[in-house]
Amino acid sequence: TMKLVYKASLQGNELELTRKIAAPNKESNVISFGGQVFQQQVFDGKKGYAVQQGRKTELIGKDLETAKKKMLPFEDMAYITGKLDRIESLDGKNTYVIIMEDTEIFYDLASGLKVKSVRKANGPKGEIKIPTNYSDYKEVNGILIPHKLDQGMGRFNLNFVLQEVKINEEVEDKDFK
């Protein structure tokens, strides 16, 4: 199991992302804004739901299938079924680009670490691309974990900084209900 707590600032308010994950594919993501739960997505390994601004919807179709395919807590392991698309220069470094369903994942050739992902999603005006940059990797219990996530969210760029990481503690089955 793994629990990660990231914090970012948006328009002067604190945004907190709490991820709880358990093998083989249980996941809970809660985004709080100004102390209130803004968005939540939970998957118990078979079924799940999302809550956004108070509206709860069950995960169905493609969203449900994607959740079932994740191999947590190390979802990069699922990318072995992806396709090596190309080698691309990113910030002056060569990266492998893997295509996995609707996401491009960039791995630094020298370090092997994931440095970026770009997920395609449907927005109100058609397809949008959501980039996430991963950096400041530090070892925690023998596992390299990115301590900075920079995510593009429309007009805003959120700079998440890891505040807390717990491995094999503080995650229970009730977290996925």
PLM feature segments, named:
Residues 1-54, 83-84:
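N-terminal mature ectodomain segment of secretory-pathway/periplasmic proteins
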Residues 13-16, 36-40, 56, 104, ...:
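Short, mixed charged/polar active-site loops
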Residues 36, 47-49, 55, 93, ...:
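Residue-level signal for well-ordered, solvent-exposed loop/turn and beta-edge residues enriched
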Residues 37-39, 46, 56-59, 155-158, ...:
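Catalytic loop of the DD-peptidase/beta-lactamase superfamily, centered on the K-T-G motif
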Residues 40, 50, 59, 84-89, ...:
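Hydrophobic, aromatic-enriched alpha-helical segments typical of multi-pass transmembrane helices
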Residues 49-75:
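Acidic/charged, solvent-exposed loop-and-adjacent secondary-structure segments enriched in E/D, K/R, S/T
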Residues 65-91, 114-116:
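Short, conserved active-site entrance elements at the starts or edges of catalytic domains
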Residues 93-176:
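Gly/Pro-enriched, hydrophobic low-complexity segments
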